[in-house]
A protein has these predicted regions:
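C-terminus-biased signal that marks the final domain/tail of proteins
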Residues: 1-20, 130, 134-276
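A contiguous strand-loop segment
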Residues: 1-127, 155-157, 250
Length: 276
């Protein structure tokens, strides 16, 4: 029992350090806010040469669950989790906001924060996934959520992608480890278009690395679709386009905050796909 408990604890801790994701918040012509994400998980956690798959990704794909979090007789929020993980990296509160987390690759990263938290006792630092759960449990608005996430001191650098219910309510919050400051990228100041934001795992004001450019194909697909055609179906197609879809992709989630609707699909990139 002790061994199982330790495994569950490690699962919840290290889950935050091996994700490679794509998140999109888009506004359709009706003024509704749609939020979509690919969860890519398991980077460097065992490559199977025979099947050309990531071992951890294949295991976790079988454990994807949609959860309805309740307080008393009231549904507070919905999330998509891997069974056993108790934080929130993908979820929405009907009529309030939606939320996804992408890992931010940085030299001053999460393992340093983990050392500070465990060894040095710096308990001011917050776990990324548990902070996501706190946001939903507080039933915050889009603006309140943005403020809380922007000022939080984190164990690991991260991107928080938040959607709301009103025109223009889509933002990418870029956070460094241990800082109360943040960079906010909104639909309004998106240089690609003013009706969506798109985030992978690299700062959107820098060029993506040549070995992992999911951002450029994502923007190309969004422009080909156009705002007038934005829907669950077209966002799913964007996230199913290689290399946005890759060997690490476990699932795609689509959320409409205005309608209180969420759909999740298991994903698998078969054949000659990018490993990440």
């Amino acid at each position: 029992l002790v061994t199982v408990f330790k495994q569950v604890v490690l699962y919840n801790v290290f889950y935050e350090f091996f994700t490679v994701c794509t998140s999109i918040v888009a506004e359709n012509e009706k003024g509704q806010i749609l939020h979509a994400r690919n969860m890519d998980f398991g980077l460097f956690l065992g490559w199977n040469k025979t099947t050309s798959t990531w071992s951890m990704t294949e295991v976790l794909r079988k454990n994807v669950v949609e959860l309805e979090w309740r307080r008393g007789n009231k549904t507070v929020f919905h999330s998509v989790n891997f069974a056993g993980y108790i934080g929130v990296l993908t979820g929405y509160h009907p009529g309030l906001m939606s939320f996804t987390i992408n890992e931010r690759f940085n030299i001053n990263g999460g393992f340093i924060g983990l050392f500070e938290w465990l060894i040095l006792g710096n308990r001011d630092l917050k776990w990324v996934g548990f902070l996501g759960r706190d946001v939903f449990e507080k039933e915050l608005s889009f603006d309140q959520t943005t403020k809380m996430l922007a000022t939080a001191k984190l164990i690991a650098p991260a991107y928080f992608i938040v959607g709301g219910t009103k025109l223009g309510e889509g933002v990418v919050i870029t956070k460094a480890r241990g800082s109360t400051k943040a960079n906010l990228s909104t639909m309004k100041n998106n240089r690609h278009a003013n009706w969506y934001v798109l985030q992978t795992n690299y700062d959107n004001w820098t060029e993506p690395p040549f070995f992992d450019d999911r951002r450029t194909p994502g923007h190309v697909c969004m422009h080909q679709v156009g705002q007038k055609n934005i829907s669950f179906e077209t966002l799913f197609k964007v996230l199913s386009t290689q290399p946005v879809l890759n060997k690490l992709t476990a699932y795609t989630t689509l959320m409409n905050i205005n309608e209180g609707r969420m759909e999740t699909y298991l994903q698998r990139c078969v054949g000659d796909c990018s490993p990440w």
